[in-house]
Amino acid sequence: MDILLLLKAFILGIIEGATEFLPISSTGHLIIVGDLLDFNDDKGKVFEIVIQLGAILAVCWEYRSRLISVATTLHTNTSQRFILNLFVAFLPAAIFGLLLHGFIKEHLFSSITVACALIVGGFAILLVENLYAHDKAPAAKASNLNEITPWQALKVGCAQSLAIMPGVSRSGATILGGMIFGLNRKTATEFSFFLAIPVMLAATFYDVYKNFSLFVFEDLAMFAVGFITAFLAALVAIKTLIRYVANHDFKGFAYYRIVLGIIVLAYYW
């Protein structure tokens, strides 16, 4: 058993789980740290699929009561509208993802690209937060998930499509998009969590289909370590972010993105 490989799996599992649902780009962090750990080969790419699945299941577990409630009340308008909103928001990312997935993975998965996206995204967060601080942004209309309209969901889904670029952050794009298009901060954050389920599951199964031959039994221990650490770290991150957004804005994440992006650019240039 390669202890160093398991240590890399542990580190990357924590990074995936801790960053997947924060507006700082988990993919960007995995690319940067993967480069530093020399773990961006085919084995590393397959490993990312496993830890992303761990993070997805953390959302399912945290919101299991809501998911079970929706599944058992499909005949109600509330549940049907919730599913419709997720489907509508999922479509733009699915379309752009299928069209551009291969090109982006081949040409844009680099630390330099991530650094630039981190910096631009950081300033975007500051812009949105400043608009809200000066009451120039649209007033929040949806104070809970049941009040989101399909039109709002579609616009959030379009914002999410920006996250096909590594370093942008899927959660950041959906949360900020939600805030811009009429959701309050907490509702936008929770909708981002739920939207992660179909989006990330679709991406994960697509990657499994494309890379199935790279999964080997000898890597089972590495996969297990990464999966478990990603699951646990994601649970902590989800609970922490929900508490955080009750009384804080996202400017701290913006400054973190900008500083990290500058450091990465300086390191590689």
UniProtKB/Swiss-Prot annotation:
May I ask which residue range the UniProt record assigns to the signal sequence?
none
Q: Which PANTHER family match?
A: UNDECAPRENYL-DIPHOSPHATASE
Pfam families membership: BacA (PF02673)
Q: Which GO terms describe its biological process?
A: cell wall organization; peptidoglycan biosynthetic process; regulation of cell shape; response to antibiotic
Which key words are in the record?
A: Antibiotic resistance, Cell inner membrane, Cell membrane, Cell shape, Cell wall biogenesis/degradation, Hydrolase, Membrane, Peptidoglycan synthesis, Transmembrane, Transmembrane helix
An annotated GO cellular component of this protein is:
plasma membrane
Q: What is this protein called?
A: Undecaprenyl-diphosphatase
Membrane spanning stretches:
43-63, 82-102, 108-128, 188-208, 222-242, 249-269
Highest taxon of source:
Bacteria
GO molecular function per UniProt: undecaprenyl-diphosphatase activity
* Enzyme's top EC category: hydrolase
Similarity section? Belongs to the UppP family.
What is its membrane topology?
Multi-pass membrane protein
| Species for this entry | Methylobacillus flagellatus (strain ATCC 51484 / DSM 6875 / VKM B-1610 / KT)
Remarks, miscellaneous: Bacitracin is thought to be involved in the inhibition of peptidoglycan synthesis by sequestering undecaprenyl diphosphate, thereby reducing the pool of lipid carrier available.
Task: Give the reactions, separated by semicolons, that this protein catalyses.
Answer: di-trans,octa-cis-undecaprenyl diphosphate + H2O = di-trans,octa-cis-undecaprenyl phosphate + phosphate + H(+)
